[in-house]
Amino acid sequence: MRILIAFAAVVLADCSSGPSPERNATREPWYGQTIVQLASIDRQAENAFKAGKSDQAAALIQQGQPLMDRLLAVPKPTLEAVEAASDLDDLYGRMLLSNRHYGWARMFFQKNVARWKHWTPQTPGTESRLKQANSAIEECDRHIGD
């Protein structure tokens, strides 16, 4: 009798439904809203940097960092999210480069190389971003020995 009960328990356990499918966070409303927020911060920080307001640009970059982290924490972030994150890192790298912090700047540009080198599918836009990041690294490397 115990064997029959054990067998029934195994069969019933095996028939249970599997784990529920994971929700795709990129389809949640917060995800799209966060991309819009980060892209807006990117533009504001870029404009501040171009206007010579480095402190304001730096504050905006800090404000965008948690948004970037949240967007990239999902299993498969969208192209738009990665582009917004890339723009933030590129701007920060350029700011560091302009302040002669070549090693730190190189690190931020290297993050973009890693992003775009491994992005699939490759598009003209992602290839252009990869080329831009590699050029920025070359610029850093020219100055590191100074």
Name the predicted role of every residue range:
Residues 16-29:
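Bacterial Sec signal peptide processing site at the extreme N-terminus
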Residues 28, 32-36, 76-83, 128:
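Residue signature of alpha-solenoid helical repeat architecture, marking inter-repeat boundaries
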